[in-house]
Amino acid sequence: MDVIAGDFRELGYAIVANDALQSLIKDVRAKFERHFIPRFGDDTTRNRNIIKLLAEDVDVKRFFCSPDLTAALDRHLGIAMPVQTGPIVTHYTANDRIGNNYGLPYHQDWPSMGTSSRAVIAWTSIADVRKGAPGLSIVPGSHLRGLWPGKQTDRGYVLDDQAIDGACDLEIDAGHVLFMSPYLVHRTLTSEVTDWKLSLSCRFDDFSCDQWSRRGFVSAYRTAVDRQVYLSGF
């Protein structure tokens, strides 16, 4: 996979491209449109559950575990032993069909991970993202300041300063992969576009990181089991 935009070390992000992964994302989009969207209804909880299940689709897992992607982590970011330190996350941000139009303001992902300083987020969209459509706005180079002043909320670590200069709206083709530092300042864009936009992300760390080892390989993510859910719907 070749870097087609950005510089991870200097700017905090890099976009990489691969024909095979783009083809795989086309299959995921077709599956989403054919099998997932028709199941949407007025029940927002059910809709959210449907969206979450796309993250468990076998082709989506193949995408984030592909040899091409893991090789790119090593080649471009120096992550020799990548491990997933969180689930694959869905971001459905075009409208309120799932009951949430996120529009998350400027924030950083590191406090929601809490793993190593070498962590990285791999993000992709299953539809092309162009200006004026919902997507991401990033502040290149902002990762070099480390953790900015902010507050941890239920939605993430939101920055105190929301009047930030130097931001740019990303344009990215479906299936291209954005590697992003967890310290990179970014926000989720909304728009008046009525069509849906769905992106997916997964967080990686380097198991060979000595600093993370000294911290006991901690992670902010936990696995929880609701042992009463089997009673619902009856």
Where do the model's predicted regions map?
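Non-heme Fe(II)/2-oxoglutarate
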Residues: 3, 27, 36-38, 177, ...
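Conserved hydrophobic/aromatic beta-strand scaffold that supports enzyme active sites
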Residues: 13-15, 121-125, 167-169, 177-179, ...
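Non-heme Fe(II)-dependent double-stranded beta-helix
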Residues: 1-106, 112-113
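Short, conserved beta-strand element in jelly-roll/cupin
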Residues: 107, 114-131, 171-172, 179, ...
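Short acidic/polar capping segments at secondary-structure boundaries
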Residues: 89-96, 110-111, 118, 126-131, ...
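Double-stranded beta-helix
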Residues: 129-189, 209, 217, 221, ...
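Short, well-ordered beta-to-alpha junction loops that form the rim of enzyme active sites
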Residues: 18-20, 86-88, 125, 141, ...
